Amino acid sequence: MSKEFSRAQRVSQQLQKELAVILQREVRDSRIGMVTISDVEVSRDLAYAKVFVTFFCVGEQTPETCLAALKEHEVPVRMMLGKRIRHRLTPEVRFTYDNTLVEGMRMSNLVSDVVNTDKRKMAESGRTESDEGEE
């Protein structure tokens, strides 16, 4: 029977949970705002963890400023993580901004705009959607 998940995937899931707790309860920095960990990728040797984050920015905060502030906490976060997990080696944590949500929303808006434009043009020309299928 083969393993359903590799060790790296299991460690990745554990790190995601622990890092979420650490960022929520331990890291006190108003420049960061609300952080969501969308994914954690761990190297095969478990030495490095690439942590994908998104931010809910308030006021003048931007994802770039929030990420810069969060990167200042990489070493202390790694130390806190080492105390919480029982591994021989605590992975080196690297925070990366995850723009997939923003890009997905942008693409969805573009598709909606195109559909609305097509409907408007069809209405202006006096055609209906059922006329389209008959051609």
From Swiss-Prot:
Q: In its UniProt record, which GO terms are filed under biological process?
A: maturation of SSU-rRNA
What subcellular locations does the record give? Cytoplasm
Which Pfam families would you find in this protein's record? RBFA (PF02033)
Asked if Metal-binding is a keyword of the record, the answer is no
Keywords on record: Cytoplasm, Ribosome biogenesis
Specify whether Cytoplasm is a keyword of the entry.
yes
Q: What GO CC annotations are associated with the protein? A: cytosol
The organism's place on the tree of life at top rank: Bacteria
Q: What's a Gene Ontology MF term here?
A: ribosomal small subunit binding
UniProt-listed InterPro entries: KH_dom-like_a/b, RbfA, RbfA_dom_sf
Q: What binding partners and quaternary form does the record give?
A: Monomer. Binds 30S ribosomal subunits, but not 50S ribosomal subunits or 70S ribosomes.
Q: Which PANTHER family match?
A: RIBOSOME-BINDING FACTOR A, CHLOROPLASTIC-RELATED (PTHR33515:SF1)
Q: What does this protein do?
A: One of several proteins that assist in the late maturation steps of the functional core of the 30S ribosomal subunit. Associates with free 30S ribosomal subunits (but not with 30S subunits that are part of 70S ribosomes or polysomes). Required for efficient processing of 16S rRNA. May interact with the 5'-terminal helix region of 16S rRNA.
**According to its UniProt record, which protein family does this protein belong to?**
Belongs to the RbfA family.
Its protein name is Ribosome-binding factor A
